[in-house]
C-alpha cells in the first residue's frame, strides 16, 4: 500500500545516471514538471508527444549539462523501473525493458506516462505531499543557487501558471534550511 513515506523514499531512491561528479537531471526535471501539473489538477497520465517531449527538452537545455543533444524520452521511459511510474500504450513499441524506444514510436503510439494509480491517488488525497516531494527533489538534485530559478522555469513552461506551487516549494525549502 502506498504511503507518503514510501513515495518519499522511492523518489529519494530514483536511479540517476552519474559519471564522476556529473549527474543527469533528466528524471528530477521530469518529476518536477509532472508534480507542478498535478498541483494544478492535471490528469494522471501525460502524452509524451504533446505534453512531455518539448517541455522536458526545454528544461534539459536550460538546466542540464551542455550536450549536443538531449533525450527526454530516456527518463520518461526509464522512470518505470523506479517503482511509482506507469506507462500506457507501450505494447506496440519495439523496445521493452529499460532501453527506451525511439521518440517516433512514443509519439506514433500515443505512449502516456505518469505516477501509477496508487501513488497518484495518494497525491490527490494529500496535495501538501506534492510540494514536499518537489522540495525534496530540488534539494537532492539541484544546487541551491538554481533551485528558485528551476522552480520558476518549470512554472513558465506550464500553460497556466500556478503561483502557489512556487511559493509552497520555496516555503518548504526555507523551513528546512
What is each of the regions a protein language model found here?
Residues 4-151:
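Short helix-coil boundary/hinge micro-motifs
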